[in-house]
């Protein structure tokens, strides 16, 4: 077993990397208390109150430097990608010149969500259509059909609402972490 310390950007950095959640993993289950802790931890790091530690992830290499299965950490990684979709939506709504100079949603989407046909995170089949519609394609009209899909949709809304309340400079500083 090999341990590698990495940043969030380093985790997603390659246009070829993709992560799949194996069929035996549970569906998305995080709720508001988890989302709040996730966001609070990020904001504390920005304020210098702590060094955000995302935690350990256990990956199985399927194809070296390209394809991995997430054995442990799938709830955190799924939440992170939902958070980034919400972050992209929030910064896109804000028309400040500073935000536009610093943040290109197209560039960040390529890094964190997809590059062409390569989707970075593939949830379990049960949640995949929902995830692709709400997070990858940003379809606001997608109708959920399960508790886990409801949670994906609610997480996206939770983060968008929370980010809407923050100053643009704070939101942009999240991208630097």
Language model: regions and residue ranges:
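Glycine- and hydrophobic-rich flexible loops that cap the catalytic core of alpha/beta enzyme folds
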Residues: 1-177
């Amino acid at each position: 077993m090999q341990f590698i310390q990495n940043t969030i950007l380093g985790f997603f950095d390659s246009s070829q990397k993709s992560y799949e959640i194996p069929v035996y993993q549970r569906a998305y289950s995080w709720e508001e208390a988890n989302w709040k802790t996730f966001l609070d931890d990020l904001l504390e790091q920005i304020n210098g109150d702590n060094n955000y530690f995302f935690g350990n992830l256990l990956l199985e290499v399927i194809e070296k430097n390209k394809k991995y299965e997430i054995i442990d950490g799938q709830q955190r990684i799924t939440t992170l990608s939902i958070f980034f979709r919400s972050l992209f939506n929030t910064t896109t709504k804000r028309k400040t010149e500073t935000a536009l100079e610093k943040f290109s949603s197209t560039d960040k989407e390529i890094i964190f969500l997809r590059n062409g046909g390569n989707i970075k995170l593939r949830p379990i089949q049960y949640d995949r259509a929902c995830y692709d519609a709400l997070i990858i394609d940003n379809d606001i009209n997608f109708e959920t059909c399960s508790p886990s899909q409801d949670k994906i949709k609610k997480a996206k809304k939770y983060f968008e609402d929370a980010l809407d309340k923050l100053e643009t400079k704070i939101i942009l500083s999240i991208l630097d972490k």
